[in-house]
């Protein structure tokens, strides 16, 4: 109950008109003013933040529990999920046991577009309830050049941590498209390389561990600006990329025809080539950068069966999302097996992995949703032929297609 009488705040003793509002405690002759309430809220928030900044090993899930959680969001990639789960558990054991002398194991994810690299990293952070930030390596530049300073990645993590520095310092950063900043040759360039080797050198500094001086709101540093210090030694860095020509480099080294991601099949040769640090250097990553990414995890290309499972099984699956949207319009949406197979087939042909699934369905779903709600449409069974002509699904309900 809000009061505007001569009653006083039980905390500061002030009354109207010194304060704008008094709130009465139910059933008691006690009051708190709006200003004291705001201070109390800030204090509670700060105490919760300080309590949450301490990472408790008791709350750390096992590697099997982490993989089981990832299984809910990412289809397939079992070996990659196992490797990630073990690496993450080891990383946070290291944080909880600083005297054990454990080295940080940052992670490199290699795999085609749409195989789940970003989703794996994001799901890990969500399960562990640690701050998480994503950066695109192609937008990063060396200090002094137009574009995002590498340290802006730390700013994003700090923002995700609601400016709790201690929480940010145990967070996870995912840098995508790392293969796009490979230098063009193994020889050292004599000219400035704004988007390649120079960015690798700048990233190397924060991955190795440094006390970054970052502007609290992002952007460029200014002489009069108060900076925030963030120690990056305990931040887990996961970097990812497609590395499309890596299989060729590995084949040249081993004389074995690779299978799986980037492979060409020939005869009965089925040995999978594992990428080595020397392959990454040959590709164009500088040796020092490769050395700070000791765990290399290879993701496999997705076949059509995996794409169908991605359509229907995970939390937030595309089919489930569309069924919810149609449900809001009073329509029960189902898909035939043939329709799912055709969507997966077309997505596979696009060579964009799981990302292609939504692109295949988007227009037909949009066209149908535009016509809803309708009193005579309570259910739709979506067939393969409707992908190119979605309004056919409504013709039996008497809808005439517009010209």
UniProtKB/Swiss-Prot annotation:
What is annotated about its quaternary structure and interactions? Component of the ClpX-ClpP complex. Forms a hexameric ring that, in the presence of ATP, binds to fourteen ClpP subunits assembled into a disk-like structure with a central cavity, resembling the structure of eukaryotic proteasomes.
Q: What does this protein do?
A: ATP-dependent specificity component of the Clp protease. It directs the protease to specific substrates. Can perform chaperone functions in the absence of ClpP.
Q: Name one GO cellular component term.
A: HslUV protease complex
Organism superkingdom = Bacteria
To which species is this protein native? Answer: Deinococcus radiodurans (strain ATCC 13939 / DSM 20539 / JCM 16871 / CCUG 27074 / LMG 4051 / NBRC 15346 / NCIMB 9279 / VKM B-1422 / R1)
Please give the Pfam families that the UniProt record associates with this protein: AAA_2, ClpB_D2-small, zf-C4_ClpX
Q: Where does ATP bind?
A: 112-119
Which HAMAP family does the entry link to? ClpX
Q: Which parts of the sequence belong to the ClpX-type ZB domain?
A: 1-52
Per the record, the GO terms for biological process are: cell division; proteolysis involved in protein catabolic process
Molecular function terms from GO: ATP binding; ATP hydrolysis activity; ATP-dependent protein folding chaperone; protein dimerization activity; unfolded protein binding; zinc ion binding
Regarding protein family, the annotation reads: Belongs to the ClpX chaperone family.
Q: Where does Zn(2+) bind?
A: 9, 12, 33, 36
Keyword annotations from UniProtKB, A to Z: ATP-binding, Chaperone, Metal-binding, Nucleotide-binding, Zinc
Report the protein name in the record: ATP-dependent Clp protease ATP-binding subunit ClpX
Which CDD domains does its entry note? Answer: RecA-like_ClpX
């Amino acid at each position: 109950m809000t009061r505007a009488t001569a009653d006083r705040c039980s905390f500061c003793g002030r009354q109207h008109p010194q304060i704008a509002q008094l709130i009465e405690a139910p059933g008691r002759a006690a009051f708190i003013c709006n200003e004291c309430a705001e201070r109390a809220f800030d204090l509670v928030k700060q105490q919760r933040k300080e309590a949450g900044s301490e990472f408790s090993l008791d709350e750390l899930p096992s590697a099997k529990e982490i993989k089981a959680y990832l299984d809910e969001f990412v289809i397939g990639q079992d070996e990659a999920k196992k490797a990630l789960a073990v690496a993450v558990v080891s990383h946070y054991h290291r944080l909880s046991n600083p005297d054990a002398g454990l080295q940080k194991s940052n992670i490199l994810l290699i795999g085609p577009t749409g195989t789940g690299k970003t989703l794996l990293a994001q799901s890990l952070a969500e399960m562990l309830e640690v701050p998480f930030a994503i950066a695109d390596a192609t937008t990063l530049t060396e200090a002094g050049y137009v574009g995002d300073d590498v340290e802006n990645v730390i700013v994003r993590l700090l923002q995700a941590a609601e400016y709790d520095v201690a929480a940010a310092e145990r967070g996870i950063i995912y840098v995508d498209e790392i293969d796009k900043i490979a230098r063009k040759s193994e020889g050292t360039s004599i000219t400035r390389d704004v988007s390649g080797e120079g960015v690798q050198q700048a990233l190397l500094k924060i991955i190795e561990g440094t006390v970054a001086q970052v502007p609290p709101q992002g952007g460029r540093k200014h002489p009069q600006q108060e900076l925030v210090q963030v120690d990056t030694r305990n931040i887990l860095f996961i970097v990812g990329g497609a590395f499309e020509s890596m299989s060729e480099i590995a084949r040249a080294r081993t004389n074995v025809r690779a299978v799986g991601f980037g492979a060409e099949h020939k005869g009965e040769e089925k040995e999978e080539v594992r990428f080595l640090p020397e392959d990454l250097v040959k590709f164009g990553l500088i040796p020092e950068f490769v050395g700070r990414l000791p765990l290399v995890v290879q993701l496999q290309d997705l076949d059509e069966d995996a794409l169908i499972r991605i359509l229907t099984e995970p939390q937030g699956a595309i089919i489930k999302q569309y069924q919810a949207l149609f449900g809001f319009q009073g329509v029960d949406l189902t898909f035939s097996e043939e329709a799912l197979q055709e969507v997966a087939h077309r997505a596979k042909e696009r060579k964009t992995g799981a990302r292609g699934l939504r692109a295949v369905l988007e227009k037909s779903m949009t066209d149908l949703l535009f016509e809803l709600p309708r009193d005579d449409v309570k259910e739709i069974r979506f067939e393969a032929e409707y992908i190119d002509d979605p309004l056919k699904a409504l013709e039996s309900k008497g809808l005439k297609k517009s010209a």
